[in-house]
């Protein structure tokens, strides 16, 4: 159904961490779908309903084929929850991606690492023939992504690969700002958060510059591989 499925624990995780890469892949002709694991109901700013509206607006800006929500519990999702893992595996079988991009394996917010674990478990069991997963009463055929990548979030992690997003930094900032409730607003009466400061967008740009330096480009997004990557031609690396 799609070439790439991006998974985020919360609405805005995807946009903050890998939207430049998604813009780039869409321009190359690849199809992209989005899966949020929860509605962000424990978030400090905004409401779950508003965040869903913002998420849908962001998906439209990005050009995603769909945006689904698994409606897991914000703050309490974990890979030991069979139902949660099977639910995400069901979405993977529906989408049939060859590439899944998911949360950082460790980060400031505990949900991010747990979402990474859920994605890893779900990618595996989605390919098990003996596991019957249904959607709207119909069994879904097994489907296992070929590649699982983890994007990098609040905490700095050393990337295994970096994608050059120099052409798409402005689009990344635009799609991030679709989540208006979460970021700086001088008229807001809601509490401050780590991402609502006036200089946060500058910090986001600085992070992209840092990862860009790894491969000699202006701006980049870093990713961690779930397993060693195989290549056909070392001369094509840059």
What do these predicted regions represent?
Residues 1-5, 80-238:
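Metal-dependent de-N-acetylase/amidase catalytic core
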Residues 1-95, 235-237:
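Active-site rim/loop-helix segments in enzyme catalytic domains that contact anionic ligands
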């Amino acid at each position: 159904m799609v070439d790439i499925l991006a998974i985020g624990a919360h609405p805005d995780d995807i946009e903050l961490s890998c939207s430049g890469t998604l813009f780039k892949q869409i321009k190359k002709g690849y199809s992209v779908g989005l899966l949020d694991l929860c509605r962000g109901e424990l978030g400090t700013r905004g409401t779950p309903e508003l965040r869903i509206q913002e998420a849908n607006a962001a998906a439209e800006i990005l050009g995603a084929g769909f945006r689904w929500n698994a409606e897991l519990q914000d703050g309490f999702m974990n890979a030991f929850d069979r139902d949660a893992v099977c639910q995400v595996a069901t979405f993977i079988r529906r989408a049939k991606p060859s590439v899944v991009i998911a949360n950082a394996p460790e980060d400031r917010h505990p949900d991010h690492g747990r979402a990474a674990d859920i994605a890893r478990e779900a990618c595996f069991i989605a390919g098990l023939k003996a596991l019957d997963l249904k959607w709207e009463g119909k069994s879904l055929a097994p489907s296992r992504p070929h590649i699982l990548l983890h994007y990098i979030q609040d905490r700095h992690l050393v990337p295994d690969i970096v994608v050059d997003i120099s052409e798409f930094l402005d689009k990344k900032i635009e799609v991030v700002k679709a989540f208006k409730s979460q970021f700086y607003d001088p008229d807001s009466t809601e509490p401050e958060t780590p991402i609502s400061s006036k200089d946060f967008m500058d910090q986001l740009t600085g992070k992209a510059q840092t990862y860009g330096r790894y491969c000699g480009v202006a701006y980049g997004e870093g990713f961690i591989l779930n397993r060693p990557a195989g290549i056909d031609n070392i001369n094509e690396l840059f």
